[in-house]
Amino acid sequence: MTINTDDQYADGESKTTISSNRRYSTSSFQDQSMEDDGINATLTNDKATLIQVWRPKSYGSVKGQIPAQDRLTYTWREIDVFGQAAIDGKSREPLCSRLRHCFTRQRLVKDFNPRKHLLKNVTGVARSGELLAVMGSSGAGKTTLLNELAFRSPPGVKISPNAIRTLNGVPVTAEQMRARCAYVQQDDLFIPSLTTKEHLMFQAMLRMGRDVPATPIKMHRVDEVLQELSLVKCADTIIGVAGRVKGLSGGERKRTAFRSETLTDPHLLLCDEPTSSLDSFMAQSVLQVLKGMAMKGKTIILTIHQPSSELYCLFDRILLVAEGVAFLGSPYQSADFFSQLGIPCPPNYNPADFYVQMLAIAPNKETECRETIKKICDSFAVSPIARDIIETASQVNGDGGIELTRTKHTTDPYFLQPMEGVDSTGYRASWWTQFYCILWRSWLSVLKDPMLVKVRLLQTAMVASLIGSIYFGQVLDQDGVMNINGSLFLFLTNMTFQNVFAVINVFSAELPVFLREKRSRLYRVDTYFLGKTIAELPLFIAVPFVFTSITYPMIGLKAAISHYLTTLFIVTLVANVSTSFGYLISCASSSISMALSVGPPVVIPFLIFGGFFLNSASVPAYFKYLSYLSWFRYANEALLINQWADHRDGEIGCTRANVTCPASGEIILETFNFRVEDFALDIGCLFALIVLFRLGALFCLWLRSRSKE
């Protein structure tokens, strides 16, 4: 379809000869009554009093309307976004420079391919009380625009330094936007073992600021949002993993993700495809909730792909994106605009489908389609609607000013001060609250998978029984000494590989969830790491206990309770050192497959330096310092000291002639170049390695989080 260009504007641009009287019905929301968003006194006794007294500032008046001075108008000008392409696919900066950028919060500077121009000079205004829908064909840049409006540029994307983004005329930073804006992203990321209610409880504890006085209020808010989007029936259903672990349906997952971001009742809300994976009824329910929020004075911006006619009628304004702005205005204005271009929407045709088709690149018609899109964008750029938008954006950006809001900000700069309930670093919850919530969620994940715990313990018992059967009933002679030494080293080998590979995917598997929640300022890196690792600590104490308790008596090791407890203590330390090393590999690896590939070749050198295969005095000088990181070395020495230090001459039988016989425990230790006086040092080094490897894992996780900001 082509555009009629028979007539001309005075400035030479095309003028259409076709007009349209097509009008669209308004939403039934115009007559919908408002309900109080505040928390009513529905509980009894002290809880009821508490809930009745507290009402968050964002709820405004009794009917839920946001006071005029607190409403937000979001404007953006000259948004140009480029796809990043480093020369030859490699960064031009060395690793040390990139690490320095992580510490200084400077972004990497790479060459950009000018052909990858994702968004071109996008200008727009989103007013409070309006529902603005961003539409366009696939790949038009809808999500890219929303990411930039939310200050969440993905890796490989750069926004022009000339871009201006303001709230009520005041330029905002990423930290200020995080405190005032909720962003519902298209991909739903969850901890699959949690139920819907548990997930919302976790979100409420960390998202609802310190101005919310008590936990019962946050839990009451969770009950409210479960009711609002019909999630009550699945409140106790685990979220699961689509196609792998049965749980929530796609629609229920989408509604849960939506409500996670809107728990705090934000004044500015960005939603990327909030209706994807929803049926028509639930899609309308979600948009009705958004429409109701907009009618209370909130600013709502959403992207949507091919909405139905009924959903289209809910939008106050639409923004059509085709690399640049093809149109921004009300549905009424869009009908007139396209009619004047000679391409009116046919009768009984969904306007949203029609506009998206007009702005799409059809196969085998790329040149023709791009010309049509360019003409539409150029026509809109010189239209009165576009001029009004630019004029409005200029006024909001300070040329004219909005008196109502700017008067308030002049005396009390709302946008330059931390939001209520948010500390100076941008976190709503305290350090202890973050730690407690992460610990609670991680512990729930462990408890929700009892089969995994049972399998781990059963596996440990089976391996221990097998080793005990092989080395059963050793006697103190030459062969027995060799067998006992081998079995003790096998303790270390089994504990290492079993625990390294048990945790090697812990952080890699949750990395997308962690990065998203970290960017939303739900918690710090250290609270996440500590809570996650401490929750798994009981399992890594139980496993060595089961293993040692089975093998120790079966092999016939030194029959004294003190020696058994010492062996159990050393094996437990080894289990936690290897677990810490597994955490380090997991945090340093970009994927689970990479972590699994890196693990074995990294562990093997430490195994060789353990003193069993290579005498500690024979380690090459160039590997000497690396051997100091071998937990096998310290644990093997400690176990052998515990086993042989008390054996005197004559206690070990020499049953073979012409064979060297270690007549005492001291001789056995000298064979390995071990010394009794180094026992305390070995224990201290094992503790030091636990701390060192965990600090290394925390540092790697911190680097990963910084690189995504």
Curated annotation (Swiss-Prot):
Alphabetized InterPro entries for the sequence: AAA+_ATPase (IPR003593), ABC2_TM (IPR013525), ABC_transporter-like_ATP-bd (IPR003439), ABCG_dom (IPR043926), ABCG_transporters (IPR050352), P-loop_NTPase (IPR027417), Pigment_permease/Abcg (IPR005284)
Cellular component terms per the entry's GO annotation: cytoplasmic vesicle membrane; plasma membrane
Polar residues bias spans: 15-32
Membrane-topology descriptor: Multi-pass membrane protein
Disulfide bonds: none
Localization per record: Membrane
Glycan-bearing residues: 485, 658
Residue ranges, annotated region (Disordered): 1-35
Record's keyword terms, sorted: ATP-binding, Glycoprotein, Membrane, Nucleotide-binding, Pigment, Transmembrane, Transmembrane helix, Transport
Occurrences of domain ABC transporter (ranges): 103-348
Primary role: May be part of a membrane-spanning permease system necessary for the transport of pigment precursors into pigment cells responsible for eye color.
NCBIfam families: 3a01204
Family: Belongs to the ABC transporter superfamily. ABCG family. Eye pigment precursor importer (TC 3.A.1.204) subfamily.
Annotated protein name in UniProt: Protein white
